[in-house]
UniProtKB/Swiss-Prot annotation:
Transmembrane segments: 6-22, 28-44, 50-66
Cytoplasmic side: 23-27, 67-76
InterPro entries: DUF2198 (IPR019242)
Name of this protein: Protein CsbA
Source species taxonomy: Bacteria, Bacillati, Bacillota, Bacilli, Bacillales
Record topology, Extracellular segments: 1-5, 45-49
Recorded topology in the membrane: Multi-pass membrane protein
Cellular component per GO, a single term: plasma membrane
Alphabetical keyword list: Cell membrane, Membrane, Transmembrane, Transmembrane helix
Subcellular location: Cell membrane
Amino acid sequence: MITKAVFALFFPFMLVVLFTRVTFNHYVAIALTAALLFASYLKGYTETYFIVGLDVVSLVAGGLYMAKKAAEKKEE
């Protein structure tokens, strides 16, 4: 359970960062990460709502981080 919680905190954040670097658009990256998370929920890899909540928090944090980076890049 602790391992899944740690992974739920880090992996969605890192996926948003990775997909943003690949697609050059943080909105697309958030959508791709959310789609992967939704597919894993449907497949049954999530046991508790606590893990789902951690996934959502990490996804939002990744989106906010990349939005901040995009704003910094526009200022340059």
